[in-house]
Amino acid sequence: MNTKKILIVSVVLVAILVFAANSHAQPITVAVDLGHGESNKYLSYIMGNITGVQWRIITTTITPDVLKGVDILLLGQPTVAFSPDEIQAIKDWLFSGNKVLYVAGDSDYGPGQKTIVQINDLLAGIGTKLRLEHGSVYSDNPNVTAKAYYRMLTFVEPDNVPGLFTDIIKQGVTKPILMHGPGCIIWQDAQGKYHDPVKETFPGLIRIVWAHKAYIGDNTPPIPYVYDPMTYGKGTGDHDFVMYAAEYFSDKNSLIVVAGESLYGDYEPAWASSYYGASLDGPLFVQNLIKWWVKLITTGPIERKLGDLSQSVSTLSGNLNQLSSQVSSQGSAIQKMQGDIQSIKNDVDSLKATVNSLAGTVNELMILVIVEAVLIVVVLALMFLRKPKATSATEVKK
């Protein structure tokens, strides 16, 4: 039985590996949206340097047909709201499996507050917990800024998530990346309560880029959802904020990444390699980020299927052990039943002997009763014969 099980598992494993290897025989397609007011600043540099994927530009309404064949979708700081149909199309595409959606936001400075609202509507419609905070992240510390409090130098410090290859994001990165006038990331639970991802996490959350020694600015209403300026504002000390975060949907092997500023198209995108004298690892970070997404899309299905196979083998092994135990239990029950049957047979034989013995005894008793009855009849007869006859008085007188 063990040999058969190993053979079956081997065949299934080979089939899974072949399927997964062929599932992305074509290059990964990255689509960049420019149809919702996004700028294309630095996009040509990004596309020119990252050549291991196919690039596609979207300038029209987003529909299922437009997203057909797309593996990674970049929405770089859109300023025009997405329609309900577009949100549904993006959601259906994302949860079809093996997809990555990148959404970049803004701070609440100037028109950025409108972008925050529009993106949060998109995120809620898609079904992710991630949200943009309604505020700005600033610092007065010259070690984490590029000569202005709003030119934030942020740090690539991804969470180590086993099996999700997050180490790729930081490979070779030793310098900060620029986030010009950024917002930060928070998350919202099913009851509508907002949470601080620095202190509270949830299954599937991956924190990627951080701001340190910073504070919250509040430029336009409403006030920030999580980071009250009275606690996190200027003069309240140095604080940490999550600037890039992702939510991973393990059942679909899909990922959504939300950022407080964009890789491309904003005032000075994350691709920047230097800014106001600050040396940056922006290009390497962007390349690593896309490399991570490609790895997740192409290798994730194999990992997931191997995990499913391992679970199936464990379940099968458990079932076989249970069946073996049941067979052993049934064997013991059968042996006990055979013993009970033999015991009953012995009891029947004993009862039969007893009955036979009783039958002989009954026959003897019947003979004795008959003899006794005959003797009684004889005695009565003798007594009757011995009785004397009476003399007639009338005859004497005559």
PLM regions with names:
Residues 7-8, 210, 389:
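Sequence-pattern detector for short linear motifs
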Residues 341, 348, 382-383, 393:
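General helical secondary-structure elements
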Residues 21-358:
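Short, surface-exposed patches at the edges or C-terminal ends of soluble domains, predominantly
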